[in-house]
């Protein structure tokens, strides 16, 4: 059978694409977060055989379903013209003020849309799925970019961090502070007691970064906003303040307690949950640290703001600091952001693949349905040509329905795309990171442009 041979040939071509293109796409997405070796591509006989059988089975079932009604009829009935279905009123006709103002062409279009229910839902669901995929693709990219810009441009306000050695002497600490206070390139420096600790609840445990600093100082380097209301948070001595992702992992809310196991150990109470996207940070005041954990907090790190964040300025200051005894490490916030933003370039490849696949699917859906639309209504189209319709008007008669159905599909796809985007964001988040969960308006606009091109 030549058709079967052609179909199996197409299946083989698609398998080659599936074994090469999609593994690379998924692998590229994982390289955003992880350092991974080069990918090795392999073909699997069992998967290939299953895909061939599934493709043949789906094609056969669809063909039988389409031909079943025809095969049940007699040859004589098949040779006679099919009797038109009895006319039915559409719901728009019951809205008389609207129906009276519609032109004849628009009334015909409305009747045809609701007359062919299968074609209506096939087109709407098909276009809706394509739109949802494109929105999800653009939405994922905007979420990742939003995460970095929000975290490092709006929430974090410090240029660098200097960490002292564990055995730093008081005079070494004083020397570092004197240098920071006397250097004109340093706008301000905020001392804090920084350490790593394990946070534990009955259902989960993970590692977080604990920073103890005065409530009137933290606002100079970090903005804390309530994760629900967006209102600014003012730290107090009633508990610790944790990020939203950590609260979800620990399944705790304001007023709950969890165990903190670090330089000191003890139960702490959640006083607030703030908006945050990268890493886990637990903030508390020195007063609460002493009351809850029964220990004093000595500054062992400094959060710095420079007059300029350029590389030369930072390196010059870091060089002098690292030459001082008692200084262990220095880190520049811009380097962290640049590294992440560079990895975000890989997302563009994934987005392009999603957009091309969705646009191709939309074109196939519309092409096939347009052909079916014309084939099933040859007599109707011939009749309106006899009534005096020009070729352009006959084409518009058909395309007008496709455009309306596409608009319905886009509307459905906007709702589907929003929830698909949220699902993908939550599914791809790792424990140490939370992505932006709102769908950017640009994702809807760009998806509308791309889905309209095949139409």
Residue ranges of model-derived segments:
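Small-residue transmembrane helix packing/gating motifs
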Residues: 155-156, 234, 273-315, 334
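Juxtamembrane segments of multi-pass membrane proteins
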Residues: 104-237, 244, 256
């Amino acid at each position: 059978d030549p058709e079967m041979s052609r179909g199996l040939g197409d299946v083989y071509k698609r398998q080659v694409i599936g074994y090469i293109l999609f593994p690379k796409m998924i692998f590229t997405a994982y390289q955003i977060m992880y350092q991974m070796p080069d990918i090795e591509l392999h073909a699997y006989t069992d998967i290939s055989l299953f895909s061939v059988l599934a493709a043949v089975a789906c094609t056969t079932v669809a063909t039988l379903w389409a031909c079943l009604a025809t095969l049940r009829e007699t040859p004589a009935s098949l040779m006679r013209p099919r009797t038109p279905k009895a006319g039915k009123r559409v719901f728009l006709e019951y809205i008389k003020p609207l129906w009276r103002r519609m032109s004849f062409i628009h009334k015909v279009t409305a009747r045809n849309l609701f007359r062919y229910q299968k074609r209506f839902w096939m087109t709407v669901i098909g276009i809706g799925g394509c739109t949802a995929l494109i929105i999800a693709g653009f939405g994922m990219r905007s979420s990742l970019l939003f995460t970095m810009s929000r975290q490092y441009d709006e929430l974090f306000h410090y240029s660098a961090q200097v960490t002292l050695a564990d055995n730093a002497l008081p005079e070494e600490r004083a020397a570092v502070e004197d240098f920071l206070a006397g250097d004109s390139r340093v706008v301000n420096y905020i001392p804090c007691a920084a350490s790593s600790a394990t946070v534990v609840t009955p259902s989960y445990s993970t590692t977080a970064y604990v920073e103890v600093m005065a409530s009137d100082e933290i606002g100079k380097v970090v903005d804390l906003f309530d994760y629900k209301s967006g209102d600014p948070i003012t730290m107090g001595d009633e508990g610790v303040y944790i990020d939203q992702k950590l609260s979800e992992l620990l399944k705790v809310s304001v007023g709950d307690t969890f165990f903190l196991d670090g330089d000191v150990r003890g139960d702490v109470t959640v006083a607030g949950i703030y908006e945050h996207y990268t890493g886990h940070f637990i903030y508390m005041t020195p007063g609460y640290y002493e009351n809850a954990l029964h220990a004093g907090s000595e500054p062992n790190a400094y959060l710095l703001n420079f007059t300029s964040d350029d590389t030369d300025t930072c390196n010059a200051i870091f060089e002098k600091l690292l030459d001082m005894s008692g200084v262990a490490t220095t880190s520049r916030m811009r380097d962290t952001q640049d590294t992440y933003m560079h990895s975000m370039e890989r997302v563009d490849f994934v987005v392009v693949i999603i957009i091309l696949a969705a646009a191709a699917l939309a074109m196939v859906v519309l092409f096939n349905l347009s052909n079916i639309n014309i084939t099933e209504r040859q007599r109707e189209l011939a009749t309106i040509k006899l009534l005096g319709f020009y070729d352009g008007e006959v084409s518009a008669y058909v395309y007008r329905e496709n455009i309306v159905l596409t608009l319905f599909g886009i509307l459905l796809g906007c709702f589907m795309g929003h929830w698909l985007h949220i699902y993908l964001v939550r599914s791809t988040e790792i424990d140490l990171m939370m992505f932006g969960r709102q769908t950017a308006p640009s994702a809807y606009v760009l998806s509308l442009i791309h889905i309209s091109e095949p139409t």
